[in-house]
Amino acid sequence: LGALCLFPQGVLAEETVSATMKPVVVTATKTEHSLGETTADVSVVTREQIEKMPANNVLDVMRTMPGVTVDSARSFYGTSTQNKVIIRGMGGDDVNGRVLVLMDGLPVMTAGNNIFNWDTISLDTVERIEVVRGPASALYGSSAMGGVINIITRKPTEEGFKTTVGTKFGRYNTWQNKLYHTGAIDKFSYAISGSMLKSRGFNVLPEHSPKTSSNRNEFNSAREKMENYNGALALNYRFDETADLSIHGEMSSFENTGRWHIEDFNLYSNKHQGIGARLHKDFGVVDSSFSVRGDFTKSDYDNASKTVKTSEAPSRMRTVSWDQSNTFALGDMHLFTVGVAGSWGKFDSESNYFTSTRYTQKGGKELNLSGYLQDEISIWDGKLTVVPGVRYDYWRSKGYLQDTNDRVNPDKQDFASTSNVRFSPKLGVRVDPWDNLVVFRSNYGEAFRAPTLNDLFGGSIIGSSRYKSNPDLKPELSKTWDVGVDVNPTDRLTLNVTGYKTWAEDYIANIPKGKEDGYNIKIKENIDKVTITGIEANIHYQYNEYLKLFAEGTALRPEIRSGANQGNHLHNVPTRKASLGFTFSHPDWFTLQASATWLGRIWQDQTDNGDIAEGNFWLGEFKLSKRFDYERYWLEPFIEMQGITTKDEIRYTNGSRVPINMFFVGLEAGF
């Protein structure tokens, strides 16, 4: 458990010479605070940092955050079930949804399988990304077990008109184009953006994969491709200094095609539309806001055997969520936040089999209603801060399953409606006895993850494995306690260390159950108890006005504490991670950001089989750019590399490999 670890580019928001320059964060408490002034363990990536990073999507900019591991099994060639974010050991295995993803404060996880499709939003629409490590169900409800990722979109400019365009080209015929335009007219402002990312010719299947061997002659490596299109629109109207209305909508399309020499075969496609609105009013005594969001997703997955398309599995997911929040002060000591929230989701999926008469259809509906209360108590002129909070959640789900060989007279099973409730408390303490020289933090929180509709009523076939649902699943529960210290001996140097332990029960996992009809059967079950013990540390140093040094590290043990695999690790969760690097930015010279990240062993199943373990590799990246400013416009050519390694192949899992040594050249311009 003890690797010192250095601080990442992902948290460069903490790299400021003056404390007054620290960014504002809102996710930890739903109220505005400067970074480092909350009891929670928070990191931020700002817009300025994103523009300096060698990144293609949101996943890439979180790669070097402390306590955060990006399991990008197939990079931008992969789906959201293959590309995951793991926070404090949660979120890495094949059961999704232990890390909650928000957009502008509202959940954006799909109703069926509780994942966020990382390809649905372009980096050009992102203002900043806030990551809260540790349980957050006391504010946000289900799924906030390991932490919360809040993607905050860019607000339109308040005056004038601005436009930026960019393009880059690199290995595997990877090509990205993007556009962002914003303007303001009196009290009204707007922003529009669009992006395209294409790549062609990379084989995501490892050379050692049995499936690769059996299909080697049929593999269409020259034509396997991915295409990702994004578009977004933001509108804002400011009524006066105390009230405003903002609307943000986005559309995206992702396709991964051409893997085999099979006509009409699409490995995976995902089409998404989302729209959110927020009405805010400061009444003086009370600051209030109402937010609502709708997400609509359609996906399709094709399966194949050698040269034959064997099945297709289209799915449709719809989600509506809302939140009404109020913040008010009571005297000089108390700042209360009270609110109500809710969500509704619907999921429908089917599987059509072309080599048999079999047909499956499944789906369901879910409803969640909740209320939350939090008090930020400031004592002794802010030297002691205590933040208690609690949230009540009620949820109900109902579903159906049809699995038959008789399409004419199908046997459909309707499951009775089930409901559950959960109280989620938290308590945070921050002690600052010496004006930010040394700050002590400690947090206790309880969290939960309600079984998804896919867990309860779904299931799927992926390759040679068939995953079955279980309508009797219980919610996952966890309790976490952490203790941390922030040391700021000078304005240029900051050190943060946090240790934590999580006790979880009724963890859901896919348990192997032998074979059926030629498939490896895996059924979702509650495996009872899990503990995760870990430490995360980061350090950054502002050497001078232009040079910043950073490093971070994480070590943890995610352990199964009951059942047949007692004492073994949770699978697909790296147990060690370290990142280090620097940013040099001189307005008259150039900007260079470079970093390297090491991942330790990644167990592939619950048996701790070392023969099939992955991990133990370094990956580097850099971006070098130079900006030229002219009277009415600017130009910034750049070169960048991603996935730099000396290895022939990099794998997070046995079944996937990532594109490596990706070299890009590009140009951005603004006017």
Predicted feature locations:
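Extracytoplasmic beta-strand/coil segments of soluble accessory domains associated
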Residues: 59, 63-106
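Flexible loop and strand-edge segments within Gram-negative outer membrane beta-barrel domains
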Residues: 199-203, 222-228, 242-288, 292-319, ...
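Surface-exposed extracellular loop regions of Gram-negative outer-membrane beta-barrel proteins
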Residues: 255, 298-300, 346-351, 394-409, ...
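Short acidic/polar hinge/loop motifs at secondary-structure boundaries
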Residues: 106-133
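Outer-membrane beta-barrel signature, preferentially recognizing the C-terminal barrel domain
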Residues: 264-282, 315-317, 364-368, 413-424, ...
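Gram-negative outer-membrane beta-barrel transporters
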Residues: 333-336, 378-386, 394, 496, ...
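Periplasmic-side early beta-strands and strand-to-turn transitions of outer-membrane beta-barrels
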Residues: 150, 158-160, 166-168, 180-268
